[in-house]
A protein has these predicted regions:
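A solvent-exposed, acidic/Ser-Thr-rich amphipathic alpha-helical stretch
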Residues: 35-101
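Short, low-complexity N-terminal intrinsically disordered segments enriched in polar/charged residues
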Residues: 1-36, 41, 45
Length: 101
């Protein structure tokens, strides 16, 4: 990271913050009834939702279908996200969080 220009470093920080905000938006939607269409809207068209407990959903249609089941499965949820590790590499990024919910 020391070889980056100031502009590149600022862009990286802005990208990381945008990813955090997206994750927080997702959490708020989950905690407001797991609305399938709203959940899918925070993903790219070819986005992937993955969980050890619930499997993998690829794309908006599969994500919406998965979350339709969650609407009746969960009467309450509270997503508390912490300890993000976000790796930015050009136009792509990966992130992991701890969740207490």
């Amino acid at each position: 990271m020391t070889n980056m220009t100031l502009e590149e470093r600022i862009t990286r920080l802005e990208d990381i913050e945008a990813i955090k905000q997206l994750k927080f938006r997702y959490s708020h939607i989950c905690d407001d009834g797991h609305n399938p269409a709203h959940i899918a809207s925070v993903f790219a068209e070819d986005g992937i939702w993955e969980s050890e407990a619930f499997g993998v959903a690829k794309g908006h249609a599969e994500i919406e279908e998965l979350f339709r089941g969650f609407e009746s499965m969960f009467s309450f949820s509270q997503h508390n996200m912490m300890n993000p590790i976000i790796e930015v590499n050009g136009n792509t990024a990966t992130g992991i969080w701890y969740i207490m919910g």
